[in-house]
Curated annotation (Swiss-Prot):
This is Uncharacterized protein MJ1288. Coiled coil: none annotated. Belongs to the GSP E family. Disulfide bonds: none annotated. GO terms for molecular function: ATP hydrolysis activity. Gene3D superfamilies: 3.30.450.380.
């Protein structure tokens, strides 16, 4: 189980380790397939978005980064919703993203000083572009922008809930377990159900551990509850009810 009270957060800061052989780590076909109509995962994602918004009476729409936010009332479920619509990655783009993430992670070193998040984000974007050029990847502009967006989101952002973290109108973000929707408390619309879920125990545990580490604390069997402060002073409360020692080992 996880419950979070978060207002405004910034990512951890890193320097690049230049003694890494990028090409040795990164082995893949340089040509990324572009035929999205034949990509089942892409079409499934489109259908999922349609199902989320087809019954909505829309209150408000806005954009956060590359994410479109739709707030409205679902006339079938009889509940208010906060829908996050992000760029869709095809199967080939997902494979490319996962390999690129490994490369960038290999280039990241231990944090040495506090850096403004905006400067860090710009710094990472430039480094990622350099990696693209070094590997001579054949990518269109749309694919490049999407990959950069997701790399930033998962490397220094907050993964699945990154867009929620960046919405200044949200006061609380909470989740009560695997397969259950994340809920938010909005200053104007109050309690809203999102379309974001953590699909597996491993995914949720990994996320909890990451948040705890940003508070300078650890989640263990002996210490399954963390109540702490994130770097900007926001409060975090996390409770886990399963063995996470394997997840700690995985993250290390």
């Amino acid at each position: 189980m996880i419950f979070m009270v978060i207002k405004k957060i910034f990512g951890e800061n890193f320097n690049f380790n230049k003694n890494i052989d990028i090409k040795k780590i990164f082995k893949l076909d340089k040509n990324v397939k572009k035929d999205r109509e034949e990509n089942e995962s892409y079409l499934d994602a489109l259908k999922e978005i349609y199902e989320e918004i087809k019954n909505l009476e829309i209150y408000e729409k806005m954009t956060i980064g590359m994410a479109e936010i739709i707030i409205g009332y679902d006339n079938v479920e009889k509940t208010k919703k906060y829908i996050v619509i992000e760029p869709i990655l095809t199967k080939e783009e997902i494979k490319l993203f996962l390999k690129l993430r490994k490369v960038v992670q290999a280039l990241l070193d231990v944090p040495v000083e506090e850096i403004d998040k905006e400067k860090l984000e710009d710094y990472l974007k430039e480094k990622i572009k350099e990696i693209f050029d070094d590997l001579k990847l054949t990518l269109d502009d749309v694919t490049r922008h999407k990959l950069i967006y997701f790399l930033i989101k998962y490397l220094i952002g907050y993964g699945k809930i990154d867009a929620l973290m960046k919405d200044e109108n949200l006061e609380d973000i909470s989740c009560t377990g695997v397969g259950k929707p994340v809920y938010v408390f909005h200053r104007k619309y109050e309690h809203l159900k999102t379309n974001i879920k953590f699909e597996t125990d491993e995914e949720l545990d990994s996320f909890c551990i990451s948040l705890a580490q940003r508070c300078g604390k650890s989640l263990t069997l002996a210490n399954p509850i963390v109540d702490g402060s994130l770097p900007d002073g926001s409060r975090l409360n996390v409770t886990l009810g399963r063995d996470i020692s394997d997840m700690v080992q995985h993250l290390q």
